[in-house]
Every structure is written in structure tokens, then in C-alpha cells.
């Protein structure tokens, strides 16, 4: 959520930043609603003061009867009725909060202006792409290996699900352990095993609700399946005040993630790129405003390390204003090279959310010896999605005979297996 005080003091800049997100100017409407709310709040405070004064007089009166006493009683009763009505109006007029909840984060000064991915800015590349490399797509390879099943899975769960078998299931498990080991041992992230069912307020805190309600799976009893472990991890500090010396806090978690993929009809209809259920290793950092820019580079580099160790070509893109996520003020996308598609595809998003999530979930820190609190900054990064990493391995490590060479760093995690070959039942 955005800071209403900042909007109040920076109306023109607020409208300018909204326009960069392709949203019409809203400062005038917010000023009107904010003014009404502040007026009601001021009236409530005045009436509360008047009630306190009159109640004190009543309490000090020697005679608890008579015209003056009864008149003061009537005044207090009248004030209470007014207060009840005003407090009802204040509590039930949610238009201002509903409007604020729909605004995305304000873009950082470094974020390029643009409407879509075509305006994203290349930051760096890693590795060489080979235009003459073998170019079967991952699902062709997986099906031929008899280790990737879409057809039977569709009978169980419908489309956008997959069943992995044998050595591909083993590769999935190996990748999870490998990624967690790298992030905990080399990058100082603390491993968490969080819930995948969360309450709506946890989704709201992370910026998933109310705007993206249709993109998640809701249960019948007030819970939602997480679209990313970011939701569970950032809420680890909700409604807390953290001592400054404990920052940064860095969490890593592997979870299953669930997305309805509303609005993605027609895209990536085959294979493992876009699924309703997928495994992902997620990174979250909690830090101070002064350190969040450096922490953004840190968490991005942690994600990149996985691809470097797997020797997979990739590039890092700085997202433009029109392509950036709702809660982010600055995002790097990491895109891995897929020979089967002959293009780079997103494999990780690494975002600095500033105090946007922290304001929603009241996550603060304070210096030692001080009573003053400040909102933390939250950051997140994919570290990485298991399915898309497997896609990249299958396509970049495929052989003429359809077998898949195991990347060197995974051989020990695969129990010494160096190559995946077709499975014969």
C-alpha cells in the first residue's frame, strides 16, 4: 500500500508515477476522499474532548440531580449519539482504502518507462547461445524418455498438470536439494518450511489481494493456496518490530505453488512452462530502506548463481514500468536460453518492494535504545522454479539419441547418475 501522507504532499509526482504505470491521474479524487476522512476524524476528536470535559464536570458535581445535572447528561448522551454515527461512517466508508489498495507500487527512478516487455532494458548476459544446437523442446524429450506424462495426468487433474517419473522425478528432487544447499551455505539464507494454505489477510499483505483474487485458488473455508512462497515468507514478520541489529533477515523455502493462470489462455499450452501446480525455491529478504538497493543486487546474484553452476546461458533484464509486478518498485527478470524455442524465457523475477508490503502488514524495525519505529523494506526472488529449470536442462543438455546429460554439479545429488536415458516399462 502507498503512503497516504506522501500522496498528500506529492500530488503531481503521484499522478506522474501513476501515468508511468498507465493509470489515469487520481490525486484529486484521493485528496477529496482523504479530506472527508480527516474532517470526520477531526470532528470525532473534538466530540471526544467535549464528552470528556462534560463527563468530568458531571463527576465533580455535588448534586446528582437538578436541571444543570440533567442538562449535562443530555449533552453527553447527544455527543455519544453523534460519535456513534460518525464512527460508523468512518469505519464503513472504505472507498479511500479500496482505492489505495488498487494502486501498484511507485516505480523507482532507475526503472525505464515502457508499456510492455519490448521496452525492458538488457543489464547483462551469461554464457553463449548456440544457434546450431539440438533443438527439441523439453516436452518432446520428456515424452520420448517415457518419464514425462501429460496424457494420463490430464485424466486425473485436467490440463496444465504434469507427472514426472523415474530419473526425471529424481532430477526434480536433486534440483531442490542443490538449490537449497547453495542458498543456505553460500548466500546465508535461513531455510523455512512454511504452510501453502494461507488466510486472505496474508495474501493481502503480500500484495496478491484484492487485485489478483482470480489468479489464485481459494478454498471454501477462507484459505488460499499460495501462488509463491513469498506470501508465507514475508508474513513471517507481519505485525512485528524487529531490532535493527537482526537485519537483514534472509529466508529461503521450497514449496509447491498454485496458480489459476487466469488470462494466460493460448500461451504455452504444451509442456511445463505454465502449470497450475509447480515447485519453486523462493528467496525473501527483510532489510532497512538504506540497504534495500544493495540487497536487491545481492538477492538477484543469489538467483543467478544457480544458473551459473548449472552452466545455463541467461540474461538479466531490468523491467520497464508497464511490465513490472504490482508490489514491486524495481524488478530484474532472469531469462534462460531455451534452444527448443530459440529464445530466452523468464525463469526468475527478483523484486524490491520497498515498504509497500511492510505498510500493509505493519512490519517495522527500530534502532537499539530508540522508541521510534520505521517500516522495513521487503525483497523477493525466485531461486529458482524447479520445473522451468528442468526445462532448461533438458533442452540445453540434450543429446542426439534423446538422452540428457546430467550437469556436473548435480551428479552427486543424482547418486552418481551421469545421463538420463529412456525408461522401458
From Swiss-Prot:
Keywords: Aminoacyl-tRNA synthetase, ATP-binding, Cytoplasm, Ligase, Nucleotide-binding, Protein biosynthesis. It holds the Pfam family Seryl_tRNA_N. Pathway: Aminoacyl-tRNA biosynthesis; selenocysteinyl-tRNA(Sec) biosynthesis; L-seryl-tRNA(Sec) from L-serine and tRNA(Sec): step 1/1. PROSITE patterns: AA_TRNA_LIGASE_II. It catalyses: tRNA(Ser) + L-serine + ATP = L-seryl-tRNA(Ser) + AMP + diphosphate + H(+); tRNA(Sec) + L-serine + ATP = L-seryl-tRNA(Sec) + AMP + diphosphate + H(+). This is Serine--tRNA ligase. ATP binds at residues 259-261, 346-349. It comes from Rickettsia rickettsii (strain Sheila Smith). GO terms for molecular function: ATP binding; serine-tRNA ligase activity. Consists of two distinct domains, a catalytic core and a N-terminal extension that is involved in tRNA binding. It is found in: Cytoplasm. Catalyzes the attachment of serine to tRNA(Ser). Is also able to aminoacylate tRNA(Sec) with serine, to form the misacylated tRNA L-seryl-tRNA(Sec), which will be further converted into selenocysteinyl-tRNA(Sec). Signal peptide: none annotated. L-serine binds at residues 228-230, 282, 382. GO terms for cellular component: cytoplasm. Its EC number is 6.1.1.11.
